Curated annotation (Swiss-Prot):
Its EC number is 3.1.3.5. The gene is surE. This is 5'-nucleotidase SurE. One of its GO terms (molecular function) is 5'-nucleotidase activity. SUPFAM superfamilies: SurE-like. It comes from Thermosynechococcus vestitus (strain NIES-2133 / IAM M-273 / BP-1).
Length: 265
């Protein structure tokens, strides 16, 4: 298959190198377009007031891989690849392997997930894959799982407009407990801004904080991605770009009937 690979950790991150090389060795036609530097937590931002530059990268990936390092955001990378760099559209966009999980509300900030979502917006099935650790650097189990997942999706394709957000425990493959389909969990942060002063006497702030994970127990629903990783399971969460709250449409329709006279329309 033709694969476009992006990330948000940048061209020198070991996760994207392991992923791209593994998929190229498996026989896929791989193109990498990723940021030229660290771009984590940039969300789905695009560069609209500056030029975007893309430089060919050599001697970083497997010899069969074409690669560019882009000055823009992760979403820029996918948009530029699809609109200008690639001769043919890919069969899949794969974003990762991210250093650190993308669970719960992380997905709203994640450049990794946003790069994959850009593919879905353009009508291309996409996968975001993350290793659930900031300190473990063995990306091979996650890369091997991605290869198997792509084979499965080739035989049984995704429905349209679906992104698979995959989180892999940072464990040897033999210690991973299995694979489960999950829903988005709750993972918040108790933010803390550290106030500091630079050498010129100017005040600045450094964002820190603690992760707060919730484990709601509901036997009538699928487990959450947060629960799955806590149980050493690979989490696969289907996402889409439609953020409409379905029940809210019905509730607000009823609400509008009650307040309609106040609008004088």
């Amino acid at each position: 298959m033709r694969l476009l690979i992006a990330n948000d950790d940048g061209v020198f991150a070991p996760g994207i190198r392991t992923l791209a090389d593994t998929l190229a060795i498996a026989g896929h036609e791989v193109v990498v377009v990723c940021p030229d530097r660290e771009r984590s937590a940039t969300g789905h931002s695009l560069t609209v007031f500056d030029p975007i530059r893309a430089e060919v990268v050599s001697d970083r990936f497997h010899p069969r891989i074409k690669a560019w390092a882009c000055s823009g955001t992760p979403s820029d990378c996918v948009k530029l690849a699809l609109g200008a760099l690639l001769e043919q559209p890919p069969d899949f966009v794969v974003s990762g392997i991210n250093q650190g999980s993308n669970l719960g509300t992380d997905i709203l900030y994640s450049g990794t997930v946003s790069a994959a979502m850009e593919g879905v917006i353009e009508g291309i099935p996409s996968i975001a894959i993350s290793l659930a650790s900031f300190t473990v650097h063995d990306f091979q189990p996650a890369a091997d799982f991605t290869n198997r997942l792509l084979k499965a999706l080739e035989n049984a394709p995704l429905p349209p407009k679906v992104l698979l957000n995959v989180n892999v425990p940072a464990l040897p493959a033999s210690e991973i407990a299995g694979v489960v389909i999950t829903r988005q969990g709750i993972r918040r942060y108790h933010d803390l801004f550290q106030k500091r002063v630079d050498p010129r006497g100017k005040t600045y702030y450094w964002l820190a904080g603690e992760v707060v994970e919730e484990y709601p127990q509901d036997p009538n629903q699928a487990p959450t991605d947060v629960e799955a990783i806590a149980q050493n399971l690979i989490s696969i969460t289907p996402l889409t770009f439609d953020l409409t709250y379905g029940q809210g449409v019905q509730d607000l329709t009823e609400w509008l009937r009650t307040v309609q006279p106040l609008f004088n329309l």
